[in-house]
C-alpha cells in the first residue's frame, strides 16, 4: 500500500479531491489536517495556511490518482508525495475490496 501526502490551499479543495478519488474507487481513505507552511516562492519567503490531504491507496492506482489530483488541484506545482507502507493484513484486505 501507499500513502500520498498532498498539500492543498484549503479544506474545500482537499475534500473535493478526496471525494472524487473515493467515488472513482482509487483510494481507500482520506485524512485532512490543517497546517502552516513556509517556502520560497518567486524569490520571496512565504508563509501560508494550507491543508494536508493524506490518501491511503493501493500502489497500482498511483498513476491514476496522480492524474486526477493534477486535474483538480489549484496549484501550478502541486506536491504529490508517495510513501510506500506496510500495513496489517486486515486493513490491506479491506482496502483491496473497496
Which residue stretches match the model-derived regions?
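Positively charged, small/polar-rich N-terminal and surface patches that mediate targeting and assembly
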Residues: 1-98
Amino acid at each position: 500500500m501507499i500513502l500520498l501526502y498532498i498539500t492543498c490551499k484549503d479544506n474545500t479543495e482537499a475534500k473535493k479531491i478526496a471525494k472524487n478519488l473515493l467515488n472513482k474507487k482509487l483510494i481507500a481513505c482520506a485524512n485532512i489536517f490543517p497546517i502552516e507552511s513556509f517556502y520560497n516562492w518567486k524569490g520571496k519567503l512565504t508563509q501560508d495556511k494550507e491543508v494536508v490531504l493524506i490518501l491511503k491507496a493501493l500502489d497500482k492506482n498511483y498513476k491514476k490518482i496522480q492524474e486526477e489530483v493534477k486535474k483538480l488541484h489549484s496549484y501550478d506545482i502541486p506536491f504529490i508525495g508517495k510513501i510506500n507502507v506496510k500495513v496489517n493484513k486486515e486493513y490491506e484486505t479491506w482496502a483491496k475490496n473497496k
